[in-house]
UniProtKB/Swiss-Prot annotation:
Domain SCAN box: 52-134
Keyword Nucleus: yes
Known function: Transcription factor required for myelination of differentiated oligodendrocytes. Required for the conversion of oligodendrocytes from the premyelinating to the myelinating state. In the developing central nervous system (CNS), involved in the maintenance in the progenitor stage by promoting the cell cycle. Specifically binds to the 5'-TCAT-3' DNA sequence. Has transcription repressor activity in vitro.
Protein name: Zinc finger protein 24
Residue location of crosslink Glycyl lysine isopeptide (Lys-Gly) (interchain with G-Cter in SUMO1): K27
Name of the gene: ZNF24
Residue numbers of Phosphotyrosine PTMs: Y335
GO molecular function annotations of the record: DNA-binding transcription factor activity, RNA polymerase II-specific; RNA polymerase II cis-regulatory region sequence-specific DNA binding; sequence-specific DNA binding; zinc ion binding
Keyword Translocase carried by entry: no
GO biological process: myelination; regulation of transcription by RNA polymerase II
Gene3D superfamilies referenced in this protein's UniProt entry, alphabetically: Classic Zinc Finger (3.30.160.60), DNA breaking-rejoining enzymes (1.10.4020.10)
Length: 368
């Protein structure tokens, strides 16, 4: 993937750009060749995500010459990956995490980044938790529907906070549903939307709280075409579309002038400028932008495991852990490699397996 495509697919709006520029300018002036010894203390640097973005967005025109360009890229990469404090395995995991997030649909990228995963496994857990929230067969239909609507409303607020056009916001619920299907990769069907046993997949209904619109430049979730993720495919025209062109945006950000239709979305957006993370862990001091993320994090300290397997009694701190564990009893392996046909019970294992295929291809190219 080129640096330009990564930039287009994975750019986040970053906080306090003036402070970031100042820190980078001082750092590069003190240590233009990227030598150790004159570095700013690591605990005084901004979030590594800032430097990852600068590394990916850096242009040749930003430097006076090729030597300076290489030097600045090297320094930005060091500030992102921080080899002084990270092991080789941690650095590798950061690169894998970046690529994994970059290949996700835009809405899922936002969802994952908002949970601040530190490695690929945590990112997978975030997506599997979302999947289980959207489709938990053990809950009454009315409760599942309400939880789905709450998740959609929450997701819309996050998307608005990133300043996306309103036409893209209305496709969020569809994207979340597709995310659930993509993660499972359970169904195999033909171009008519039939499953392996020949039955038509049931038509999905949209919650009335969210209207579906076409999304310019992305997959049209209003009238979907056949979309394959591994061996999973989805039928054409399965969603009913509604429009609400009268949507208004009455809340304005004083910092950048962006408009929002919800006051809560404006509050979330303003944290981009302030860098605010109001939900702090009293045990370790780690801060989060959302209370739900803090609740999940606190289970690391408390040892709480509210999700219990009915087969063997083993308990887990997150629902996704229970779902993965239950596949030991059922033998279910829903994640299949399209290149060799090998199946896995967890999507993270399939992701690692696919990386080996890609690594083998890269080695063959290098040998040639």
């Amino acid at each position: 993937m080129s640096a330009q495509s990564v930039e287009e697919d994975s750019i986040l709006i970053i906080p306090t750009p003036d402070e970031e520029e100042k820190i980078l300018r001082v750092k590069l002036e003190e240590d233009p060749d990227g030598e150790e010894g004159s570095s700013i203390p690591w605990n005084h640097l901004p979030d590594p995500e800032i430097f990852r973005q600068r590394f990916r967005q850096f242009g040749y025109q930003d430097s006076p010459g090729p030597r300076e360009a290489v030097s600045q890229l090297r320094e930005l990469c060091r500030l992102w990956l921080r080899p002084e404090t990270h092991t080789k395995e941690q650095i590798l995991e950061l690169v894998v995490l970046e690529q994994f997030v970059a290949i996700l649909p835009k809405e899922l990228q936002t969802w994952v980044r908002d949970h601040h995963p530190e490695n690929g496994e945590e990112a997978v857990t975030v997506l599997e938790d979302l999947e289980s929230e959207l489709d938990d067969p053990g809950q009454p239909v009315s409760l599942r529907r309400r939880k789905r609507e709450v998740l959609v409303e929450d997701m819309v607020s996050q998307e608005e906070a990133q300043g996306l056009p309103s036409s893209e916001l209305d496709a969020v619920e569809n994207q979340l549903k597709w995310a659930s299907w993509e993660l499972h990769s359970l169904r195999h069907c033909d171009d008519d939307g039939r499953t392996e046993n020949g039955a038509l997949a049931p038509k999905q209904e949209l919650p009335s709280a969210v209207e579906s619109h076409e999304v310019p430049g992305t997959l049209n979730m209003g009238v979907p075409q056949i979309f394959k993720y591994g061996e999973t495919c989805f039928p054409k025209g399965r969603f009913e579309r509604k429009r609400n062109p009268s949507r208004k945006k009455q809340h304005i950000c004083d910092e950048c002038g962006k408009h929002f239709s919800q006051g809560s979305a404006l509050i979330l957006h303003q944290r981009i400028h302030s860098g605010e993370k109001p939900y702090g862990c009293v045990e370790c001091g780690k801060a989060f932008s959302r209370s739900s993320i803090l609740v999940q994090h606190q289970r690391v300290h408390t040892g709480e495991k509210p999700y219990k397997c009915l087969e063997c009694g083993k308990a887990f701190s997150q629902n996704s852990g229970l779902i993965n564990h239950q596949r030991i009893h059922t033998g279910e392996k829903p994640y299949e490699c399209v290149q060799c046909g090998k199946s896995y019970s967890q999507s993270s294992n399939l992701f690692r397996h696919x990386x080996r295929h890609n690594a083998x291809k890269l080695l063959n190219v290098v040998k040639v």
